[in-house]
């Protein structure tokens, strides 16, 4: 389904999605290590490319996007379209419902 916008979803389903699709590259807890991807603690309200000690692509640093429900909703559908040049090797979550569930989980998990 094209378009759509963020709607609160099911955080426990989002947690499962995170475990299977995201956790091999990202940690969420405060002080969590940067892995293949940056630690996601404090994700909401921060700018792209801003985690200390993580080597981002220039594209990511220069995107100047602030992460929130709506930017994540669009980004996670097709990361390389939203930030051309990102090194995130993830094809995206095509279903709105999956993105809603994941973002709902991330809002809690990254606080």
UniProtKB/Swiss-Prot annotation:
Query: Which GO CC terms are listed, alphabetically?
Result: mitochondrial intermembrane space
Q: One GO molecular-function annotation for this sequence?
A: metal ion binding
* InterPro entries for this protein: Cyt_c-like_dom, Cyt_c-like_dom_sf, Cyt_c_1A/1B
Which of the residues bear the PTM N6,N6,N6-trimethyllysine? 94
Give its localization.
Mitochondrion intermembrane space
Post-translational modification here is noted as: Binds 1 heme c group covalently per subunit. Lys-94 was found to be 95% trimethylated.
Keyword Heme on entry: yes
- PTM annotation (N6,N6-dimethyllysine): residues: 80
Tell me the keywords, alphabetical order: Electron transport, Heme, Iron, Metal-binding, Methylation, Mitochondrion, Respiratory chain, Transport
User: What residues bind heme c, as annotated?
Assistant: 22, 25-26, 88
Kindly list any coiled-coil regions of this protein: none
The record's comment on protein family reads:
Belongs to the cytochrome c family.
Q: Relate the protein's function as given in its record.
A: Electron carrier protein. The oxidized form of the cytochrome c heme group can accept an electron from the heme group of the cytochrome c1 subunit of cytochrome reductase. Cytochrome c then transfers this electron to the cytochrome oxidase complex, the final protein carrier in the mitochondrial electron-transport chain.
Query: What protein name does the entry list?
Result: Cytochrome c
Species for this entry? Thermomyces lanuginosus (Humicola lanuginosa)
From the broadest rank down, the organism's phylogenetic lineage runs: Eukaryota, Fungi, Dikarya, Ascomycota, Pezizomycotina
């Amino acid at each position: 389904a094209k378009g759509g916008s963020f709607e609160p979803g099911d955080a426990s389903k989002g947690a499962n999605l995170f475990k299977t699709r995201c956790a091999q590259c990202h940690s969420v807890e405060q002080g969590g290590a940067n892995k293949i991807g940056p630690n996601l603690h404090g994700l909401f309200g921060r700018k792209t490319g801003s985690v200390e000690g993580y080597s981002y692509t220039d594209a990511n640093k220069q995107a100047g996007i602030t992460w929130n429900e709506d930017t994540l909703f669009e980004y996670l559908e097709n990361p390389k379209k939203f930030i051309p040049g990102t090194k995130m090797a993830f094809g995206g979550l095509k279903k709105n419902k999956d993105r809603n569930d994941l973002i709902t989980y991330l809002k809690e998990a990254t606080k």
